[in-house]
Amino acid sequence: MSEITLGKYLFERLKQVNVNTIFGLPGDFNLSLLDKIYEVDGLRWAGNANELNAAYAADGYARIKGLSVLVTTFGVGELSALNGIAGSYAEHVGVLHVVGVPSISAQAKQLLLHHTLGNGDFTVFHRMSANISETTSMITDIATAPSEIDRLIRTTFITQRPSYLGLPANLVDLKVPGSLLEKPIDLSLKPNDPEAEKEVIDTVLELIQNSKNPVILSDACASRHNVKKETQKLIDLTQFPAFVTPLGKGSIDEQHPRYGGVYVGTLSKQDVKQAVESADLILSVGALLSDFNTGSFSYSYKTKNVVEFHSDYVKVKNATFLGVQMKFALQNLLKVIPDVVKGYKSVPVPTKTPANKGVPASTPLKQEWLWNELSKFLQEGDVIISETGTSAFGINQTIFPKDAYGISQVLWGSIGFTTGATLGAAFAAEEIDPNKRVILFIGDGSLQLTVQEISTMIRWGLKPYLFVLNNDGYTIEKLIHGPHAEYNEIQTWDHLALLPAFGAKKYENHKIATTGEWDALTTDSEFQKNSVIRLIELKLPVFDAPESLIKQAQLTAATNAKQ
């Protein structure tokens, strides 16, 4: 194969690892790089409204496909994206951040270029990103550039953390051997140390053998680090009761007869709390124990027999086995577990959320009814995205269909995240299956931060469902502090004017205020098909919130007030 430009090499490599959409914005230090996207068949440039939204979109895309790329320009562009990149770092999402930077000669001369701080320091932004990246590289040598690109792509995928790649403008068009593309990037994990893994498996088997009431608890990193299949098989083979955390929604099949619900410490349903906390063995997969994921750290296991499977270590009771990756540990555990669980006597699992009682069609829509009812509308394989606030808490009441994807930023909690994430997820879903539905639930306050990205959805003909929960302001903040404070109020928008304002030609608008209107719309066979982009405004009472959010707000307020 003949020589190709370094820029084309980057995008060919990304295409090889199943990245088909590139997010970001143009800027004069990355324009030559962006030209190369159009030289690679099967790639498209999303062209976002701003860099923060682009970072959110890259995050949403990577949560579905395992890897994404964001391209920004030096200084002003890359810094605008860093909130989104920090969220990806916190929540284990593999985003490669590619930054077009000034030429090597301009940096050497310390020229006072635009987009700099005016002090000749061209490394300051790179250093900022280093704190929220698994690895970084500023390319300075064309000879080693291809191997550095390969290293960053591999690291981003394997660790499911962001990486930073700085590409000087003068290197993008330099040539590298095209033959390097013939050897694929190795995305496989290194095997576990056999002795350490054997000790883990033997110890876990002994704990299982001596337990009478074990449970499985699936969390965020079961999805992020690609052990959903192993976790589901663990449930199938053992028949142990299985639960998820808020961040674990979508990591196991919630239609499975052994699924018991969402465990959030003191915020759990009483029967779920009792089932998990009375267990004599907890098998925890991919735990991410943040405050909102644990009911403000209110886990209260009665047993000390807890096994935590993590991406790069396993913890058995008080012993930590560094370097024992859960992917292989679970796979090898599954080979030997059937003989150990033969004598297991199945215990009942908590009843799933009961259906709503019949109410008159004129009944005003409220959150408690909405989230229970939503399960009826969802379909197998849906991507369900819930914004920080009432949606992220309410969705825990909803039972997901099989093979659903759940996206919610419970740890980082940057309001407005889900608009961009919906765009990214919609691109990814379209690439997997054009009929796959992407469904967003976002509050009226959060939407105002990132609404511009709806225009990108329209531009590309994407067809998500955009459910806007309109309850007049920042409800979660009102519940925590300042229920009538002016700073928790927002300007009222005409939500049904948004799609045409952004230039949509084919779209649907709906406004729902009663349970009857919800039922009529969500049971309509045409509405159930993702044929056009839709915005559905849900009119809800002020201060209406899921019970779990009200309790969490009280816990958060108490935590904030502690001296």
Curated annotation (Swiss-Prot):
Keywords: Acetylation, Branched-chain amino acid catabolism, Cytoplasm, Decarboxylase, Isopeptide bond, Lyase, Magnesium, Metal-binding, Phenylalanine catabolism, Phosphoprotein, Thiamine pyrophosphate, Tryptophan catabolism, Ubl conjugation. Its cofactor is Mg(2+); thiamine diphosphate. This is Pyruvate decarboxylase isozyme 3. It holds the Pfam family TPP_enzyme_N. The keyword tRNA-binding does not apply. It comes from Saccharomyces cerevisiae (strain ATCC 204508 / S288c) (Baker's yeast). Pyruvate binds at D28, H115, E477. Present with 1525 molecules/cell in log phase SD medium. The gene is PDC6. Fusel oils and acyloins are important flavor and aroma compounds in yeast-fermented products contributing to the quality of beverages and food, e.g. fusel oils in whiskey, contrary to common believe, seem to alleviate hangover. In general they are desirable at low concentrations, whereas high concentrations may spoil the product. By adjusting growth conditions and substrate their production is sought to be influenced. Due to their broad substrate tolerance pyruvate decarboxylases are important biocatalysts for chemoenzymatic syntheses, both by fermentation and in vitro, e.g. Induction: Expression is very low in the presence of fermentable carbon sources, but is induced, in contrast to PDC5, by ethanol. InterPro entries: DHS-like_NAD/FAD-binding_dom, PDC/IPDC-like, THDP-binding, Thiamin_PyroP_enz_cen_dom, Thiamin_PyroP_enz_TPP-bd_dom, TPP-bd_CS, TPP_enzyme_TPP-bd, TPP_PDC_IPDC. GO terms for biological process: aromatic amino acid family catabolic process to alcohol via Ehrlich pathway; branched-chain amino acid catabolic process; ethanol metabolic process; L-phenylalanine catabolic process; L-tryptophan catabolic process.
